[in-house]
Amino acid sequence: ELLVKNGVKFGEAVWFKAGAQIFSEGGLDYLGNPNLIHAQSILAIWACQVVLMGLIEGYRVGGGPLGEGLDPLYPGDAFDPLGLADDPEAKAELKVKEIKNGRLAMFSMFGFFVQAIVTGKGPIENLYDHLADPVANNAWAYATNFVPGK
C-alpha cells in the first residue's frame, strides 16, 4: 500500500480485497498464469487449507521429530530452538512477552480489518486522510454513518 501511494504500480488487488479475487469471473490465477493452479472454488481452497494444515499439525502433535520433548498444547514451547537463552527465568519472561506481542499484533490487524471494512481504504491511506483532516476522518465521524435513522 505504501509503495502504491508513492507511485509504484502493482497489478494485484488491495490487500484487504485480495480474497475477493476468487469470486471474479476469471477466478484466482497464481502468479498471473492461468496454466498453473486455477482456483475458482472457495470450498476447494478451504478444503486444501484444512487438509494441509491438518497434516502439519497432526505431525507436530503426533510426535514428529520437530516436536519431540515439547508440550503439544502449550503455545510458544519451541520458543528458543537454537538454545540461545541461558537463564531459565529470562527465557520464561521472554516467552510471556512474545505471546503478549503476538496478541497485540492480532488486535492491531483486527483494527486494520475494521478500518478497511468501514472506509474501504488501507491503514496507510487512512492515516494520510486523518492527518490531512483529523476532524472529518476519525472513528467518531465514521460512527455517525451507522446511526439508525440517518
Curated annotation (Swiss-Prot):
Residues where chlorophyll a 4 binds: 101
Post-translational modification: Photoregulated by reversible phosphorylation of its threonine residues.
Positions of chlorophyll a 3 binding: 21, 31, 98
Residues binding chlorophyll a 1: 103
Membrane among keywords: yes
InterPro entries: Chloro_AB-bd_pln, Chloroa_b-bind
GO molecular function: chlorophyll binding; metal ion binding
Coarse class of the protein's main subcellular location: plastid
One matching Pfam family: Chloroa_b-bind
TM stretches of this protein: 36-56, 104-124
Positions contributing to chlorophyll b 3 binding: 41, 57
Function summary: The light-harvesting complex (LHC) functions as a light receptor, it captures and delivers excitation energy to photosystems with which it is closely associated.
Subunit annotation: The LHC complex consists of chlorophyll a-b binding proteins.
Protein name per the record: Chlorophyll a-b binding protein type 2 member 2
Organism: Pinus sylvestris (Scotch pine)
